Structure formats: C-alpha cells, structure tokens
Swiss-Prot record:
CDD domains: SAHH. Keywords: Cytoplasm, Hydrolase, NAD, One-carbon metabolism. One of its GO terms (molecular function) is adenosylhomocysteinase activity. It comes from Polynucleobacter asymbioticus (strain DSM 18221 / CIP 109841 / QLW-P1DMWA-1) (Polynucleobacter necessarius subsp. asymbioticus). The gene is ahcY. One of its GO terms (biological process) is one-carbon metabolic process. Its EC number is 3.13.2.1. The lineage of its organism: Bacteria, Pseudomonadati, Pseudomonadota, Betaproteobacteria, Burkholderiales. This is Adenosylhomocysteinase. It is an enzyme of class 3 (hydrolase). NAD(+) binds at residues 201-203, 235, 264-269, 287, 322, 343-345, 393.
C-alpha cells in the first residue's frame, strides 16, 4: 500500500478484521514464527524463482493464526494470489489477520465472529475484486468446499436447504438462499472454475471421501491430513503441547491428581492423553475401535465408557471427529466444576445445543459456566465449557507451535503445487489422493535441519538388501509409522 489512505480503503472494502493497528505486532510475531518453520521457509526459498503457483487464485479457509500468515506469504511468494478466511469463529489471532491485511492480502477473519459473519466471510473469499474466480481451494474442515457444492445443489432444488439440523446449518442455509436470490448461478459458476482442493484436517477428509463415494465431488482433492509428516506430527505432537496450554490459560486449574477423560485415541487423542499424563493426571480413554482401545490399554490408560466416567472425572476432552460424543445426559451427571472441552474440529462432538436451555454465565471470553438447576434432590451445579465446545486449543490458546505447523503447511504448499501443475493433464482425475512418500520424506528432511539431527546413509549393499534406493523412499506405502 502506498499510503495510509490506500491501506484504510483496502481494509474497508476488501477485508474484515478487528483492528489494522495490530499489524506491527503481528509482523513481529510472524518474523519469530519464520525462524521456527524451517520446512515451509525452505520450500519458499527452493521454489520462489520458479513461481510454480503463478496463475493460481487460492481461496483459503483455515485458522487465521501467525503460523497461517507464514503459509499465506509462502503461497504468494510462489506466485499465487490469495484470499483468506478462518475456518473457526474463535481461532483467529487478530494481530495475524491485521499483518496479512497490511501486506495487501484480502482477509476476512475476526476472533469471536458470529456464525452469520463466518458464512458471509466464507462467501467473500470466493469474490475477487476484478470479477475473476477462484481456481484452487486450501481447506481446513471442508467448509469452503462444502459451500460451493451445497450451493450448486440448491441452485437445482432448494429443498436440500429445508431441514437444518443445527443452528449453524440454519444460518448457512439462510446465507445460501440469500445469495441465490441475488445470483441464481453464483455457486455453480464458481464451482466449475475450481481445479482442486487440498484438505488439512481429519474432519474435512471424511467429508471429501463421503462426497466422492456419493459421486458428488466435482474436482480432485489431495488429503494432506494423512501425510505422515502431518498426522503423526501436527495431530499428535501439536495437540500434546497446545491442549494443556489452552486448558490452563482458560481455567488456571491444577491438572495433577485429577481424573481426565480423553474421548478418542487416534493421533489427536494420543497427544492429548500424553499431555495430561505428563502433568500427572489420571488419564482414562473412551474408544469404539478395539485396536485403538488396545493401544490405549497397552500405554497404561484405563479404557472406560463415557456413561461410566461422566460422574467421576474432573476434565473431559473430546478428540474423535464424531457427533455427540459427550451428550446432555453425560454433562447432567458430571461433578460440580467439571471442565468440558473439545479438540476435534466441530462443536457437535459435545452436545452444546442440548445445554443451551440452561443459564450460561461468561467468566471470560471462551470460558463459560453452564448452570444446571437443582433437581432430584441434588443441588445446583456448574460445569465449565471451554470455547463453547469448539476447538479449545485455538479458542482458549494460540494453537500448535510454529515448528510442528511447519510440517503441516509444507505439505499444503507441496500439495497446491502438485495439483496446480497437473491442471490440463490426466494426472489427477476427480478423486481423493495423498502425497507420494518421497514428498513426505522431503518435508521430514527439511524439518530435521534445525534439530541437530544427522541421518545415517545406507550403503549400496544395505539399500539392495531391503529393496530401496539410497535416497528413499524407505518404506512401502502400506507401512504404518
């Protein structure tokens, strides 16, 4: 921006942020984050001269954090144009959004935005100032992808919008109807221009596979979540550090000695359980999958049901990606001052809608007492709900550390390059793909450089013996790390 007036006009017309004056603070934190994101910066340096994303117009729907700012600026350094919104109403870091806006990138993200604003912002990232169109999506949770597909269906028959099952669906469906009244082909026009999507998280990946199985997916997708250097690092090690940070910021509770229940023992649940045990909580795990349950038991965790644990534990963490894992009845049974939070993507893991009928008392932003009235001879009680059942580590904390996000976002950039450079070929017909293992290993090598790690090099004989090249890949695709 040439002048303050230019910047203010850009922010007023092409952004929705909390406070542009926070941009200097955001820029300083971005500079620190870059020193902790070796993989992402190495990819920026390697590919900047080639401009492999030239011509790409990327709509991004992903938590607008300091680490995401480094991702955005990497995409732009490689030639892309970018517009961004957060994928969660509580996860934005306002100084990060301000710094990105000050750099001339349209961004629509405010911490604590309403659901109406959320879906308005998700629409706006598909609208370009020159009237052009998005041709790539970078998604987290699948909302940007869902919006275009659902809207295009509604163009043919709005009956698909008639029966919302939640407050969020009610607001989303109303937003789609409003847009269709303004432009009856808004969604299909944009949908047909998109060449591909890269999806960040487990929940969004589930949506993609479901859409593909039903024949509804209209463009190819790369499942970034299941790259080893994403799921086994971001999901596990990231949650291991960010969960308890968020709980303690929100409540100042002493974790040691308390009984903590982790619902789900996938990678996110594993990291969450490790974090709570490291602070000397007694950790119980709930699971539906006997393999994951056996893993938990072999790690020394007690495997129980929520029905059993509800009135006994002190801290509850949902980490499943599933629906109503913690129900109204579970919360009704809980102890006074029990803490309930979610580290899965959507708020419906906890039946927040089922307890909205009770009195809510805000303690501070994203920390609420829900007051259950006296009943059946039991006195009034309060439970603590964090981030209104949405992602606790970003609602009540600052999310995962920069270093682990470098792995995830390096995969995102590589996936965007991979899809964009395949446009016009038959390399990626409509479907859901994962990145090849040699790219996974590349990300790991880049990340290792700052950890004083020195890799052993196979001899020719050793490589021949196990049937690999000296340069890798070192494992078969079916290998489970």
């Amino acid at each position: 921006m040439n002048t303050v007036s230019d910047l203010n006009n850009f922010v007023a017309t092409r952004c929705a942020i909390a406070d542009i004056s926070l941009s200097d603070f955001g820029r300083k934190e971005i500079a620190i984050a870059e020193t902790e994101m070796p993989g992402l910066i190495a990819i920026r340096d390697e590919f900047a001269a080639q401009q492999p994303l030239r011509g790409a117009r990327i709509t991004g729907s992903l938590h607008m954090t300091i680490q995401t700012a480094v991702l955005i600026e990497t995409l732009e350094a490689l030639g892309a144009e970018v517009q961004w919104a957060s994928c969660n109403i509580f996860s934005t870091q306002d100084h990060a959004a301000a710094a990105i806006a000050a750099n001339g990138t349209p961004v629509f993200a405010i911490k604590g935005e309403t659901l109406e604003q959320y879906w308005d912002f998700t629409h706006r990232i598909f609208e370009w100032a020159d009237g052009g169109y998005t041709n790539m999506i970078l998604d987290d949770g699948g909302d940007a992808t869902l919006l275009l597909h659902l809207g295009a269906r509604a163009e043919k028959d709005q009956a698909c919008l008639n029966n919302p099952t939640s407050e969020e669906e009610t607001i989303l469906f109303a937003a789609i109807k409003k847009k269709l009244a303004q432009d009856p082909t808004w969604y299909s026009t944009r949908l047909e221009k998109v060449k591909g999507v890269t999806e960040e998280t487990t929940t969004g990946v589930h949506r993609l596979y479901q859409m593909f199985a039903k024949g509804e997916l209209k463009f190819p997708a790369i499942n970034v979540n299941d790259s080893v250097t994403k799921s086994k690092f971001d999901n596990l090690y990231g949650c291991r550090e960010s969960l308890v940070d968020a709980i303690k910021r929100a409540t100042d509770v002493m974790v040691a000695g308390k009984v903590a229940v982790v619902c789900g023992y996938g990678d996110v649940g594993k990291g969450s359980a490790q974090a709570l045990r490291a602070l000397s909580a007694q950790v119980w795990v709930t699971e539906v999958d006997p393999i994951c349950a056996l893993q938990a038991a072999m790690e020394g965790y007690r495997v129980v049901t929520m029905d059993y644990a509800a009135d006994k534990a002190d801290i509850f963490v949902s980490a499943t990606g599933n629906y109503h894992v913690i129900t109204h009845d579970h919360m009704a049974k809980m102890k006074n001052q029990a803490i309930v939070c979610n580290i899965g993507h959507f708020d419906n893991e906890i039946d927040v809608a089922g307890i909205e009928k009770y009195k809510w008392e805000e303690i501070k932003p994203q920390v609420d007492h829900v007051i259950f009235p006296a009943a059946n001879g039991k006195p009034e009680k309060r439970i603590i709900i964090l981030a209104k059942g949405r992602l606790v580590n970003l609602g009540c904390g600052t999310g995962h550390p920069s270093y682990v996000m470098s792995s995830s976002f390096a995969n995102q950039v590589i996936a965007q390059i991979e899809l964009w450079n395949a446009v016009g070929t038959d390399k990626y017909p409509i479907g859901v793909y994962t990145l090849p293992k040699h790219l996974d290993e590349k990300v790991a090598r880049l990340q290792l450089k700052t950890l004083n790690a020195e890799l052993t090099v196979l001899s020719d004989q050793q490589a021949s013996y196990i049937g690999v090249t000296k340069e890798g890949p070192y494992k078969a695709d079916h290998y489970r790390y």
